[in-house]
């Protein structure tokens, strides 16, 4: 029996997340991301998007609102924030992953 690529990816992702959590890096990266998003005004913008989306619906639905807001929210993250967080994640991965 062979394991599919998706199963391998999911397993690898779970192992990396476990290492991140156990090392304390998950919390550190998460805290830095939260600080940057707050400083950039991202949270306020996403709240505004959510209020607008919900006010347009007769019967607001979380899943539908999320599907509408999420792409916009991701686009609102400043590139400098994305780059800084990716550098942290990359540095962590370079510490734990053996390369040949």
Swiss-Prot record:
GO CC terms of this entry: DUBm complex; nuclear pore; nucleoplasm; P-body; SAGA complex; SLIK (SAGA-like) complex; transcription export complex 2
Alphabetized UniProt keyword annotations: Activator, Chromatin regulator, Cytoplasm, mRNA transport, Nucleus, Protein transport, Transcription, Transcription regulation, Translocation, Transport
Subcellular location: Nucleus, Nucleoplasm; Cytoplasm, P-body
Pfam families attached to this UniProt entry: EnY2 (PF10163)
GO term, biological process aspect, one: positive regulation of transcription by RNA polymerase II
Principal subcellular localization: nucleus
Gene3D superfamilies in the record: 1.10.246.140
GO molecular function: chromatin binding; enzyme activator activity; transcription coactivator activity
Superkingdom of origin: Eukaryota
InterPro entries found in the cross-reference section: TF_ENY2, TF_EnY2_sf
Family listed: Belongs to the ENY2 family.
Quaternary state and interactors: Component of the nuclear pore complex (NPC)-associated TREX-2 complex (transcription and export complex 2), composed of at least SUS1, SAC3, THP1, SEM1, and CDC31. TREX-2 contains 2 SUS1 chains. The TREX-2 complex interacts with the nucleoporin NUP1. Component of the 1.8 MDa SAGA transcription coactivator-HAT complex. SAGA is built of 5 distinct domains with specialized functions. Within the SAGA complex, SUS1, SGF11, SGF73 and UBP8 form an additional subcomplex of SAGA called the DUB module (deubiquitination module). Interacts directly with THP1, SAC3, SGF11, and with the RNA polymerase II.
Function of the molecule: Involved in mRNA export coupled transcription activation by association with both the TREX-2 and the SAGA complexes. At the promoters, SAGA is required for recruitment of the basal transcription machinery. It influences RNA polymerase II transcriptional activity through different activities such as TBP interaction and promoter selectivity, interaction with transcription activators, and chromatin modification through histone acetylation and deubiquitination.
Protein name in the entry: Transcription and mRNA export factor SUS1
